[in-house]
From Swiss-Prot:
Keyword annotations: Cytoplasm, Flavoprotein, FMN, Oxidoreductase
Name of the protein: Albonoursin synthase
Organism: Streptomyces noursei
pH dependence remark: Optimum pH is 8.
Reactions the enzyme catalyzes: cyclo(L-phenylalanyl-L-leucyl) + 2 O2 = albonoursin + 2 H2O2
EC number(s) recorded for this UniProt protein: 1.3.3.13
Primary localization class, coarse: cytoplasm
Length: 219
C-alpha cells in the first residue's frame, strides 16, 4: 500500500519502509542471496554503461527480482511518485529502440521510467513543482538501483534520455498524467566490460570547507 506524507513515513528524519527480505536478485525474496553474487562494494565499483547486448533472453523471474530491487530506492517523503513500464516482447523492443536513438544495441528488455504527475500536481503550484522536481531525482535513483541489480546479476544497461517521448507515450498507451523520463535497456553484455574513466577523487571531493582537497585524517 502506498504511503503518503500524512502517514508519517519518517522517524527522526529517516524514511521508514516495510522490511524486505534478501537482496532480491535472481532468487526468491524469501531466500538468502546466493553466494555466487558479488559483494555490494564490487558491484558499485565495477558497474559501467552497457550499450551492446548478446542475443539472449532474460528470465522473467529475474526481471521481477530486478524490479523489486529498483522499487527499493529512496523516495522523498515516501511519496513514490513514479511509474515504470516493462517492454519484453521482441517486436515491441525493436519498435521502442527505433524511436530511442540513444540506444545502440538491441536489449533483452526495456524499462521506461516515469514520473506520476497525479501524485505531484495535486498541491499548490509552488509545492507541486518542488515535489515534481524531487520526484525526477527519485526516478533516477530507482534507475540506478535497477542498473546495479542488473550488473550484480550478470546483466547490464544504460539510462537513456534521448528518445521520442511523444511517440513512445503513444506507442505504449501511456496515460497523460504519466511522464516518461528515461528509457533503460537491459540485457546480457555482448563484450567484456570496460570501466569508464572517472575524475580523480581529489578533483571533486572537498573536506570540511570548499577547496580543501586533503583527505580526512584517519582516527
Amino acid at each position: 500500500m502506498r504511503r503518503h506524507p500524512s502517514h508519517s513515513p519518517y522517524r527522526g528524519g529517516c524514511e521508514v519502509r516495510p522490511k524486505r527480505r534478501g537482496l532480491m536478485l535472481a532468487h526468491s525474496s524469501s531466500e538468502s542471496p546466493p553466494e555466487s553474487l558479488p559483494d555490494a562494494w564490487t558491484v558499485l565499483k565495477t558497474r559501467t554503461a552497457v550499450r551492446n547486448y548478446a542475443k539472449e533472453p532474460v528470465d522473467d523471474a529475474l526481471i521481477e527480482q530486478l524490479l523489486e530491487a529498483m522499487l527499493a530506492a529512496p523516495t522523498a517523503s515516501n511519496r513514490q511518485a513514479w511509474s515504470f513500464m516493462v517492454v519484453r516482447r521482441p517486436a515491441a523492443v525493436r519498435r521502442l529502440r527505433a524511436f530511442s536513438p540513444g540506444v545502440l544495441g538491441t536489449p533483452a528488455f526495456f524499462v521506461v521510467a516515469c514520473v506520476d504527475r497525479s501524485l505531484t500536481d495535486n498541491l499548490s503550484p509552488k509545492l507541486s513543482q518542488k515535489i515534481y522536481d524531487t520526484s525526477k531525482l527519485c526516478v533516477a535513483m530507482a534507475v540506478e538501483n535497477l542498473l546495479l541489480a542488473a550488473h550484480a546479476a550478470g546483466l547490464g544497461g544504460c539510462p537513456v534520455g534521448s528518445f521520442r517521448s511523444d511517440i513512445v507515450t503513444s506507442m505504449l498507451g501511456i496515460p497523460e498524467h504519466i511522464e516518461p523520463m528515461l528509457v533503460v535497456p537491459i540485457g546480457r553484455p555482448a563484450t567484456a566490460l570496460v570501466p569508464s574513466q572517472r575524475r580523480a577523487k581529489n578533483e571533486v571531493v572537498n573536506y570540511e570547507s570548499w577547496g580543501n582537497r586533503a583527505a580526512a585524517p584517519t582516527a
